[in-house]
């Protein structure tokens, strides 16, 4: 009974407060109070109205202009494309050098930075002692375009390599090239791993896949034939480019030439430790000089 009485009193008290607040002089409209009422309403917080489709389109265009280089037209931005691509490829090549993939050697072409020549050495497994030359071609809209293409020259006998063209199935490992996530050194690493872990699912060379699954001895024979063919064509360049990798027979005369070049390069002043004394920790002070000394004028 006491609880019911308390609740009734509470309701009456709240209703009385509502009546007082509604009848307060601040809410009454009186002559000359229009300015105060407008100022009171202007202080209230209100959400902005939703923009119309036309307004939203205008806002998006404004944001796009702010993000683009100031004062640059699309033609001007496009003109810088080759420089952006060049710096991107330089960064990719530096990443490749830092990875130091064993048995993989790559050199960009002299005529185009979008073409890289390379060779892979295989030291164990079914393809042991294999030396496979390849050419990797990078799309012009890299890194926003498709995957690079990698072609073995000469072609090799492998389930994921086209027997006619020598092209590696790069999309098997990179279905969609993702900027800042996928890198060129990963493509080269994948090209090396296919010789150690052979995947015969969805092959580019069905004959090689079927033979690998059902007749390993016959598969090994075909691989040995492939190795001999690649060894016989090592002296041939994959393209007419000064940077295309090719092998030459090492004769005693050529060996002496290489040895002399190494000796001469080590004897040059820039190769000596004193050439970079500030980097090696050597003192730059003159012999006999004192610390904090000053010549008298």
UniProtKB/Swiss-Prot annotation:
Residues 17-42 have a biased composition (Basic and acidic residues). Residues 84-232 form the UBC core domain. It holds the Pfam family UQ_con. Residues 13-75 are annotated as: Disordered. InterPro entries: Ub_conjugating_enzyme (IPR050113), UBQ-conjugat_E2_core (IPR000608), UBQ-conjugating_enzyme/RWD (IPR016135). SUPFAM superfamilies: UBC-like. Coiled coil: none annotated. It comes from the Eukaryota. SMART domains: UBCc (SM00212). Residues 59-75 have a biased composition (Polar residues). Transmembrane segments: none annotated. Belongs to the ubiquitin-conjugating enzyme family. FTS subfamily. This is Protein AKTIP homolog.
